[in-house]
Amino acid sequence: MTDFRHRKTIVLTGASRGIGHATVKRFSREGWRVITCSRQAFAEDCPWPAGPEDHIKVDLSDQEDVGIAVAEIRHRLEAEGGGLHALVNNAGISPKFGDGGRLKSIETSMHVWRDVFQVNFFAPIMLARGLFKELSAAKG
């Protein structure tokens, strides 16, 4: 197990590709401990150290799963004696029609909109509330 007590720690959602993936690489290069969260299991082609041991698979559209992830993040932080210096809620969804067109509020099912709001609005609030103590302790 790696000793992270003397490094800053960031939790980053939506880390498996795009902006999230680039953000992980940047913070890792700067010496931060990066706890990644995404719907996918850790991809072995991701080039940062401690990747698999600091990855949490979580479905942000599922409130219960978010709660489980918060508990796991807190456990990992506590186990290593470190605080949380930053939380980046990068994950987000913007579902489209098959042709790439935007969804219409009247025609799109409420189930889809609930998932969009859960991932884009409620999950970040749940993560911030759940990790507030750790963020405050580290002045994050």
Question: Over which residues does each language-model region extend?
Answer:
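A short, exposed helix-loop element centered on a Lys and neighboring polar residues
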Residues: 128-129
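Active-site loop of short-chain dehydrogenase/reductase
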Residues: 8, 80-85, 135-140
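Conserved glycine-rich cofactor-binding loop
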Residues: 16-17
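Conserved glycine-rich Rossmann-like NAD(P)H-binding loop of the short-chain dehydrogenase/reductase
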Residues: 30-46
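Conserved hydrophobic beta-strands of the Rossmann-like cofactor-binding core
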Residues: 9-12, 87-88, 92
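Substrate-binding pocket helix/loop in short-chain dehydrogenase/reductase
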Residues: 98-105, 109-114
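Rossmann-fold cofactor-recognition segment
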Residues: 50-64
